[in-house]
């Protein structure tokens, strides 16, 4: 028995009454997808196919984490677009395409990977996280995270080796903010409203001191 069939059987045994089983994978479009990234979707794909083989309705969901921070310029990209160093800190979806053929850095490498999957005959339900964030789909969850930030800190602190200070606990926020002035996440939240709807923050790049509301598109 293939390992994916065993996992599929275990899933069905655990949740036998599901109308549809959803297998999920996801990565950031940080550059050309290598074999390590491909393993993530391949694992979910084999389980998805095993579920279908056993007569179950299943779907393969793939999340493009394109609202993640652009952390570094890959060596092969730096050779043709060294100026992208200036865009580190922005979400991938807001970084320009170094090859000039797509609307963004994210779209370029997403299309490259999606074309490869298509050649292999892999059918995927793609989701783009920038659309979910900017549509406000996650707003209520972000508010909850801000409201319960100290509880979240306490949970994480249980797994730390060093003792946390009360100052660290007080300053902790489980969210990041992309500055609407410079577009980067070089921000520090300094306070929030009691209901978690508004955060006050500063940006080290644009030297701004602003407030972010839960409906804003740059809260993540």
Feature annotation, model-predicted:
Residues 1-152:
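N-terminal Rossmann-like or analogous alpha/beta NTP/dinucleotide-binding catalytic cores
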Residues 155-166:
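Short Cys/His-rich Zn2+-coordinating modules
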Residues 172-175, 197-199:
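Short metal-coordination and nucleic-acid-contact micro-motifs, chiefly zinc-binding Cys/His arrays
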Residues 179-182, 203:
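Short cysteine-rich clusters marking metal-coordination/redox-active sites
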Residues 186, 207:
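Cys/His-rich microdomains that often coordinate metals
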Residues 189-192:
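Short Cys/His-rich "knuckle" micro-motifs
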Residues 196-206:
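Cysteine-rich micro-motifs
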Residues 208-215:
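Conserved small/polar residues in nucleotide/adenosyl-binding loops
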């Amino acid at each position: 028995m293939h390992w994916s069939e065993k996992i599929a059987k275990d899933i069905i045994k655990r949740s036998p009454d599901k109308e549809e089983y959803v297998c999920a994978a996801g990565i950031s479009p940080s550059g050309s997808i290598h074999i390590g990234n491909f393993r993530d979707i391949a694992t979910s794909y084999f389980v998805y196919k095993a579920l279908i083989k056993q007569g179950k309705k299943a779907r393969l969901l793939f999340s493009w984490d394109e609202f993640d921070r652009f952390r570094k310029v890959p060596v092969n990209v730096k050779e043709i677009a060294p100026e992208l160093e200036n865009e580190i800190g922005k979400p991938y979806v807001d970084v320009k395409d170094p090859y000039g053929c797509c609307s963004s850095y994210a779209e370029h490498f997403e299309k490259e990977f999606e074309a490869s999957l298509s050649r292999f005959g892999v059918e995927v339900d793609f989701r783009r996280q920038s659309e979910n964030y900017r549509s406000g789909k996650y707003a209520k969850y972000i508010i909850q995270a801000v409201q319960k930030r100290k509880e979240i800190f306490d949970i994480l602190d249980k797994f730390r080796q060093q003792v946390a200070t009360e100052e660290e606990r007080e300053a902790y926020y489980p969210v990041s903010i992309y500055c609407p002035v410079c577009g980067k996440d070089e921000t520090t939240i300094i306070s929030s409203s009691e209901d978690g709807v508004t955060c006050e923050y500063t940006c080290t790049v644009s030297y701004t001191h602003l407030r972010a509301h839960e409906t804003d598109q740059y809260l993540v």
